[in-house]
Structures are given as C-alpha cells and as structure tokens.
Amino acid sequence: MVNVVVTGAAGRMGTQIVRLVAAAEGLKLTGAVERPGHAGQDAGALAGIPPLGVAVVDDLAGALAGADVVIDFTSHEASARNAELCAEKGVALVIGSTGFTPEAKARVAAAAARIPVVFSPNMSVGVNVLFELVRQAAKVLGDAYDVEIVEIHHKRKRDAPSGTAVALGEVAAGALGRDPADALAYTRHGILGERPPWQIGVQTLRGGDVVGEHTVYFCGEGERLELTHRATSREQFARGAVRAAGFIAGKPAGLYDMADVLGLRSAR
C-alpha cells in the first residue's frame, strides 16, 4: 500500500485527486494539506465523498509521518519549498504545478538528487502522447515545415504561455536540432520582416472557462499538419498525477516525467 499526501487538498485539482486516491487500488490517503482556513476538516468531506478520517492540516511537515508520496498541485514557489521538505524527510514527490522560474526549477532538481520526483508540465496522458507525436512529426518533416504553437486557457490562468506550450516547443526544437532558447518566440508585434526559418512561435490566448487546448502547426508548401489536444475537464490531469504516484513510490532518486510514468521514453 502506497501512503499518499495531497497538497492543495481543498482546491479544484486537490479535491479531484483526493477522490481518485480514495478510490484507487494500492493507494491510501494519509495526509491532506491546505492553506489556513480548512484545517481540521475531513479531506473526504471537502472532496464531496464520505469522510476518510484524514484531517486537513496547514503545514506539510505535519502530514509527512508515514508518507510514501506527496502529490503537489500548489504554486511554483510552494512546490519548490515542498520539494526541499520532502527531500529532508525522504518522501517521493509528484509535482503538477506550472509557471516555474529557473530558480524554482533548480531547487526541484536539487531535491531530485535525494528523492524520486515526477516533474511534468502536464499530467494528462493525452498531452504526453501529443509530445511524442510532435517529436516524431518534427523528425520526419524537418526544416521544410514551419512550426507554430497556439494555446488557450481560461481567463484565470496566471502564467503565460502555459508550461505545456513551452514544453511542446522544446520537444519540437530538440527534434529539429535547435536550441529552444534561440528558437522559441513568444511575442510578435510590429513590422518584423519575414519569419526566420529556425523560429518556433508560441502564441497565448486567454478567455472564458477553457480548461486547456494546445495545437502544434507544421506548415509546409501546399499542406499543413495540425496536432491538437483539447482538455474538457481537469480530471485527466488528476488521473495522471495519481498514476504517477503509484509509479514513483520506491523508485531511485532522480528527476522523472510522465514519459517515464507511461513508458514512452523506452519506446523511442
């Protein structure tokens, strides 16, 4: 049995993860963490299911006793702090937060030298299949096709572009032998001249209640290939995170992603 702690347990993602962990074979919810205001409430009741006998606390350190894995959907600042605490306690970690700064990523990487960490910009199984499709398409189509990425999310999303859009650009750039730092273009405005052939554009849209949509365009002469993933609910992100928790328990220290969880890396 894998003992799981969920951070952000009263949020939209957290409540879904609590429900899925409670229903999952081989997993047991042993801790739930949320900001002050929810402490003492039963995690199951907060998630809309029968009580689980797990009281919400407002400090991760107080929930780690006996834990095997923490599933973290908070913020990049909180996730970096939580990674350091999990490393101190020897508890594996699944991170689904986005919007990481280079400094926060470095803190997570340092923690992964001591514990196993699944760190992925998107926990959806479908999106991770999209990563592989983009990699293969870029290799086959090569420099003869221009690559552009468009993402749209709900108006409350704080970071832009999405971590998934950036990752898609990095995947395409890597497959084409380009440095993402040079190739990815996030802003276009004014008279810029002809599009550089090495460039990969990443465009952001925000509005309404869109859960998430990503399209990668491969634009050639006389044809265009579009690869799209549309999320219609957040449940697929939660399902991926719970799957990652079952995968990472007992693994050696290191930085893993959903390609490892889904066995996609070994299939390349």
UniProtKB/Swiss-Prot annotation:
NCBIfam families, A to Z: dapB
Positions with a binding annotation for (S)-2,3,4,5-tetrahydrodipicolinate: 154, 163-164
Coiled-coil residue windows: none
PROSITE patterns assigned: DAPB (PS01298)
Top-level lineage group: Bacteria
Family according to the record: Belongs to the DapB family.
Provenance organism: Anaeromyxobacter sp. (strain Fw109-5)
Designated name of the protein: 4-hydroxy-tetrahydrodipicolinate reductase
GO MF annotations, alphabetized: 4-hydroxy-tetrahydrodipicolinate reductase; NAD binding; NADP binding; oxidoreductase activity, acting on CH or CH2 groups, NAD or NADP as acceptor
GO BP of this protein: diaminopimelate biosynthetic process; lysine biosynthetic process via diaminopimelate
Pathway: Amino-acid biosynthesis; L-lysine biosynthesis via DAP pathway; (S)-tetrahydrodipicolinate from L-aspartate: step 4/4
Pfam families associated with the record: DapB_C, DapB_N
Gene designation per UniProt: dapB
